[in-house]
């Protein structure tokens, strides 16, 4: 396995609940350290690390729900519209419905198709076509 140049490591309330959530979405467990309540997961070209909150962690302040305030993780998927249908059939609550947005990128107008869901810890996941 090759590691991405940037891999977010997210503090979570319950590592087992978090693993179940991400596995249902199609994420793969690459490895885990059960004694440390840590898991490394991947999905297509994205990678995440999750660690259950503990007193010895790198906690910069009080950690309360929702975690990740002000952050959303943009995850490019191969077919965002098909993935959206899958997420709907799994009965995940949609935070923001599938939308098409136009953005200026280096003088060119690009269309991004995206939708958002929220994980059990409060992190926003934005699935996109790019």
For each predicted feature, which ranges?
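Core segments of cupin and vicinal oxygen chelate
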Residues: 2, 9-49
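Short active-site oxyanion
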Residues: 6-7, 28, 70-73
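Vicinal oxygen chelate
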Residues: 13-16, 71-121
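Conserved short beta-strand elements that form part of the metal-binding/catalytic scaffold
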Residues: 30-64, 124-129
């Amino acid at each position: 396995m090759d590691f991405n140049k940037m891999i977010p490591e997210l503090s979570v309330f319950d590592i087992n609940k978090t693993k179940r959530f991400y596995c249902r979405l199609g994420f793969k467990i690459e490895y885990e350290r059960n004694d440390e309540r840590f898991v490394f997961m991947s999905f297509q070209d994205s990678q995440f690390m999750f660690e259950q909150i503990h007193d010895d962690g790198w906690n910069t302040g009080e950690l309360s729900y929702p975690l990740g305030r002000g952050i959303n993780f943009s995850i490019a998927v191969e077919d965002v519209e098909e993935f959206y249908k899958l997420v709907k059939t799994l009965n995940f609550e949609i935070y923001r419905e599938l939308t098409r947005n136009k953005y200026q990128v280096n003088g060119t107008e690009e269309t991004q198709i995206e939708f958002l869901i929220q994980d059990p810890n409060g992190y926003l996941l934005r699935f996109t076509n790019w």
